[in-house]
Curated annotation (Swiss-Prot):
ATP binds at residues 55-62. Pfam families: LpxK (PF02606). Its EC number is 2.7.1.130. This is Tetraacyldisaccharide 4'-kinase. It is an enzyme of class 2 (transferase). Keywords: ATP-binding, Kinase, Lipid A biosynthesis, Lipid biosynthesis, Lipid metabolism, Nucleotide-binding, Transferase. GO terms for cellular component: plasma membrane.
Amino acid sequence: MRPPEFWNKPPSHFDLRACLLSPLGALYAKGTATRLRKGAPTRAPVPVICVGNLNAGGTGKTPTVIWLMEQLGAAGHEVHVVSRGYGGRLEGPVQVDPRRHSAADVGDEPLLMAAFGEVWVARDRGAGVTEAAAAGASVIVMDDGFQNPSVAKDFSIIVVDAKRGFGNGRCLPAGPLREPVATGLSRADLVLSLGDARAQETFQSIWGAEIPVPHLTGHVEPLPTGMPWQGTKVLAFAGIGHPEKFFATLRGLGAELCRAEALEDHQTLAPALLTRLEQEARLLGAQLVTTEKDAVRLPLSFRPKVITLPVRLRVAQGDTLLARLKDIAPPPD
């Protein structure tokens, strides 16, 4: 289900629906605060870096986790990721093995991240962190879980889509937030806003004064694959948080977007859907294209029919973040 448009209006914009839902938003915020106060968090014997957000839905956490896996791995770390495994049936803790696990088992994001290193799926994040440390992790990256109190975090990065920012600044269901901005950022160590220069300027003008921690910027860009996108007719489909960003990327590469099929985030790619997409692409004379996250949900027999467009995070002040990471998780001897 797509979020209502009034969620992403700036806080200065009056909307009656948001106002009427605000009491429920206050209850949601209270519930989050109560949950965060409960229980004793598991303290891992190695540093834990949390990649989270304040918004419900996609903000760019997965590319950020992959970036951290690559950078920490290059520094000599044995990096393990712990994820809840949204959309998967296994409760865990279980180490993701792409050779025997499917997206239906562990979720699409953990399966994608497992191509870059060691990934654990665990509904009980504390148990997942314990297993990862026992398996030899020298640093653990927690995928999401900023509002989960079961694991002590050494460094928390809040990822935010610069174009949408923190929306109207209200909590669910009056707005997109899991908790109030001030409350969430008081526990954060860094904010990473993702988007182009124009989006970053807008984000800074609306939210810059509200950010009490270091604020870095970045953007996600397509990897060069040798594919001649210019003028190529494509039928694109995407089941991610904001599929329109994927479609815009294809247009920016010069592809002729004959059809754009926006699916629900993590949507099951049923045989009937894939058959329809294949038939439409054939009628249009177009190539099927999808995201990396959607590709791992495709049946193996269908994957040769689809081109995947990989993207990677670029952090504008990457050296600043790398220096901070070195302090938190010194490279192994």
